[in-house]
Each structure stands twice: as structure tokens, then as C-alpha cells.
């Protein structure tokens, strides 16, 4: 019996159960479902902005945007020697974006996309999928603006899937699967907005708000 076709709705049900899809490589047509024993998360009050990053944000001439070019952000995340984003996964996230359940935050230098992050939203949970950086600190800037936005929008869970040394240096932690599922259940019981009404994120305010909570 053939497995059911992978659709955006099926993907959302998987996220609600705490599992997410990955491919072995760009050319691997198979989709593997992952439920790690230990899960990486970003405590929304624990993002660490170093002095150098704070200076970078305050003085930056980059522009931060949201959902201006979701597909290009995913493509940039996949544009590396090894990637888990195959054509099927790319298509699914673009379809989730059209449904309002996937968003991108972009960092631009002029009109050039130099950094960004994208993920899936469900209830009060944000599932970070991937990020990229074509300039020094561009992905860190994207994360700082993303976390500020998630807090303002009422999110309670930022799932990073795995914990990397880079994420750990910025304040991400690792928790057990059982703890993660409990937090996920609680996050799914409410609603949040990725585009909260009246929200404004100028660089100085982002640094100040992150400094007050970290």
C-alpha cells in the first residue's frame, strides 16, 4: 500500500505531534520523519546579544523584512554543499507559506538578500527550519529580529529541532523529548501572530528589548 500523499495539511499534523520532515540530501526523493530524543529550543527570554552584535544591529545599514520573498529565502537556505531541503520539501513549505503557516524573515543589503530564516507557525509555536548568512552576523541579526517578533506576537515555543554550537552560543538549549512534547502541547492550545498589530522593530528597540529579557 502506498503511503498517503504528503500535503501541507499532513505536514501540519506532523508538527502538532512533534515530528518534522527531512531528506538525506537535495537529490534524495525520500522523506524521513524525525522525532529527536533531545530537542533544541530557544527560550524566548534567553537570546544572548553580545556587545559586538548589539553594535552591529544599532549601526547596520541592512534592511529587515518579513515574507517579502519566502521562496528565495528557502532557496538560499538550501544553497549549500549539503542540504536536507529536497524539491518535495521546498514545494511543501512554499504551499504552507501560501496557507499562512510558514514565514520568512529576510535581511537585505540594498536589494540583495544577505541573510534570513524561515519556519512554520502553529498555535503559539514557531518551528525554525533553516537560516543562512551571506554576510558576517547576518543570520544572528535575523534571529534577534525574529525572537523579538515572536515575543511581541505571543509565541511561547521556538523549536530549533537540533542544538548546534552556534545556536547554543546565542542562548539556545537542549531539552528531553518528554519536556518538549509537554511544551508543545501547551503552545498548541493558544494563538499567536507572526505579524502582530502595531508591532515596530527598529534596530535600537530590538537591542533594548532583548537586553531587558536576556
Curated annotation (Swiss-Prot):
Catalytic activity entry: N-terminal L-lysyl-[protein] + L-leucyl-tRNA(Leu) = N-terminal L-leucyl-L-lysyl-[protein] + tRNA(Leu) + H(+); N-terminal L-arginyl-[protein] + L-leucyl-tRNA(Leu) = N-terminal L-leucyl-L-arginyl-[protein] + tRNA(Leu) + H(+); L-phenylalanyl-tRNA(Phe) + an N-terminal L-alpha-aminoacyl-[protein] = an N-terminal L-phenylalanyl-L-alpha-aminoacyl-[protein] + tRNA(Phe)
Broad class of enzyme this protein falls into: transferase
Subcellular localization: Cytoplasm
Top-level taxon of the source organism: Bacteria
One Gene Ontology cellular component: cytoplasm
Keywords in alphabetical order: Acyltransferase, Cytoplasm, Transferase
Pfam families in UniProt: Leu_Phe_trans
Disulfide pattern: none
GO molecular function, one term: leucyl-tRNA--protein transferase activity
GO biological processes: protein catabolic process
E.C. numbers: 2.3.2.6
SUPFAM superfamilies per UniProt: Acyl-CoA N-acyltransferases (Nat)
Functional summary from the UniProt entry: Functions in the N-end rule pathway of protein degradation where it conjugates Leu, Phe and, less efficiently, Met from aminoacyl-tRNAs to the N-termini of proteins containing an N-terminal arginine or lysine.
Protein family according to the UniProt entry: Belongs to the L/F-transferase family.
Annotated protein name in UniProt: Leucyl/phenylalanyl-tRNA--protein transferase
Amino acid at each position: 500500500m502506498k503511503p498517503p500523499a504528503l500535503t501541507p495539511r499532513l505536514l501540519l499534523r506532523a508538527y502538532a505531534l512533534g515530528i518534522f520532515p527531512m531528506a538525506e540530501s537535495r537529490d534524495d526523493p525520500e522523506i524521513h520523519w524525525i522525532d529527536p530524543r533531545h530537542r533544541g529550543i530557544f527560550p524566548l527570554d534567553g537570546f544572548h546579544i553580545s556587545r559586538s552584535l548589539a553594535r552591529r544591529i544599532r549601526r547596520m545599514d541592512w534592511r529587515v523584512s518579513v515574507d517579502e520573498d519566502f521562496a528565495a529565502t528557502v532557496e538560499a537556505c538550501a544553497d549549500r554543499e549539503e542540504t536536507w531541503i529536497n524539491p518535495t520539501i521546498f514545494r511543501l513549505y512554499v504551499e504552507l507559506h501560501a496557507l499562512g503557516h510558514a514565514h520568512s524573515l529576510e535581511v537585505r543589503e540594498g536589494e540583495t538578500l544577505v541573510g534570513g530564516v524561515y519556519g512554520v507557525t502553529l498555535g503559539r509555536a514557531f518551528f525554525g527550519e533553516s537560516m543562512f548568512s551571506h554576510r558576517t552576523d547576518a543570520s544572528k541579526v535575523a534571529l534577534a529580529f525574529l525572537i523579538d517578533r515572536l515575543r511581541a506576537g505571543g509565541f511561547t515555543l521556538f523549536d530549533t529541532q537540533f542544538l548546534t554550537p552556534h545556536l547554543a552560543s546565542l542562548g539556545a538549549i537542549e531539552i528531553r523529548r518528554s519536556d518538549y512534547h509537554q511544551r508543545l502541547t501547551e503552545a498548541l492550545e493558544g494563538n499567536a501572530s507572526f505579524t502582530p498589530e502595531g508591532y515596530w522593530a527598529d534596530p535600537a528597540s530590538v537591542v533594548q528589548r532583548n537586553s531587558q529579557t536576556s
